[in-house]
């Protein structure tokens, strides 16, 4: 399985890091990190973004339109934008492919490949909601990283694992990162 993971400039880069850790031995992962996300990685995780880069099979700069990822002829199974800033959400919803992250999402939509968008904002305004609805109507899976509490999380890692486990479910990757409903 070939998955493109895109990290944008919103809070919640811990979700991306954990997803990459879990996918490392399970899929070919192409990674794109926006410039804002590079700063947020340092702020939230106290690590250099290059540490995140090491978790991927391949890495591409967000302005690299000569990347093989920039073409619809490049085969991949899914794109996950985690976290997804409202700027990126708007660009994807409105077809404004000004960078490689938005371009690969545009390709996923036009080629009918799996696109998971994980918007990280609170509260949402009407524009955010309209953009999410537009993407959902186009076939994207809009998946805000909202944890469950029926599984009685003991710490932040349990909360992160629930969200990442649900992403893996949508990707069709078996996992036991969290306790499922009815097994608690």
Swiss-Prot record:
MF terms (GO), sorted A to Z: carboxy-lyase activity; flavin prenyltransferase activity
Alphabetically ordered keywords of this record: Flavoprotein, FMN, Prenyltransferase, Transferase
Catalytic reactions of this protein: dimethylallyl phosphate + FMNH2 = prenylated FMNH2 + phosphate
Database matches in InterPro entries: Flavin_trans-like, Flavoprotein, UbiX-like
Enzyme class: transferase
Gene3D superfamilies recorded: Flavin prenyltransferase-like
Chain sites annotated for binding dimethylallyl phosphate: 150, 166
Signal peptide residues on this chain, from the entry's feature table: none
Pfam family, one: Flavoprotein
Its EC number(s): 2.5.1.129
Binding locations of FMN: 9-11, 34, 85-88, 120
UniProt cross-references to SUPFAM superfamilies, sorted A to Z: Homo-oligomeric flavin-containing Cys decarboxylases, HFCD
Keyword Flavoprotein: yes
Cystine connections: none
Chain's role: Flavin prenyltransferase that catalyzes the synthesis of the prenylated FMN cofactor (prenyl-FMN) for 4-hydroxy-3-polyprenylbenzoic acid decarboxylase UbiD. The prenyltransferase is metal-independent and links a dimethylallyl moiety from dimethylallyl monophosphate (DMAP) to the flavin N5 and C6 atoms of FMN.
UniProt cross-references to PANTHER family, sorted A to Z: FLAVIN PRENYLTRANSFERASE (PTHR43374), FLAVIN PRENYLTRANSFERASE PAD1, MITOCHONDRIAL (PTHR43374:SF1)
Similarity comment: Belongs to the UbiX/PAD1 family.
Identification of the protein by name: Flavin prenyltransferase UbiX
